[in-house]
Amino acid sequence: MSLQLAEEIIKGRRLKRGEDLSFLLSEDLDELCAGADKIRKELCGNHVDLCSIINGRSGRCGEDCKFCAQSACHHTKVEEYPFLEPEEILEDCKRHEAKKVHRYSIVTAGRALTGAEMEKALRAYRAMKKECKVELCASHGLLSQEDFNRLKEAGVGRYHANIETSRRNFPNICTTHTFEDKLE
């Protein structure tokens, strides 16, 4: 079934959140991987994008994800600092672009950005879009549709939602937000 769905996607079919997500979550993993590989070969070939990230805000995260050193719930020695200045992020992006990186992403610890942090992020993305040729990505936790739209307008082409495990197992690794929160 995954190979048939892969053919449909290659021909332009767009997945529907509810029905297709439930199918993908129940599909045999080997078949799902074969379908995904078919799509990759057809749409991307064997090209590899190099993506570099910058930790835009580190530590003090109020979420309790068991695997994450950024969580304030765990006693780690991770460096803690507030959201970086846009100029610092831009300079780091330029350094990575000079090393032939294709994509660049700001990632931040925490459930979501504050209003002031979102404004800093948007300034950084706009500056990178203006001064660099890399594709821009983001990972800033749980955002509103309005914030996603603002990121897109600022030049962000991909967003990393980081769904770490299955719906069934999610409560075993995190209790401060749900699997469904990640999908909204």
Model features per residue range: what roles?
Residues 1-63, 67:
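Flexible, acidic/Gly-rich N-terminal and inter-domain linker regions that tether
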Residues 11-15, 29, 36, 40-43, ...:
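Amphipathic, alpha-helical segments enriched in basic
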Residues 47-79, 124-125, 168-171:
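N-terminal small/glycine-rich loop or linker at the start of catalytic domains
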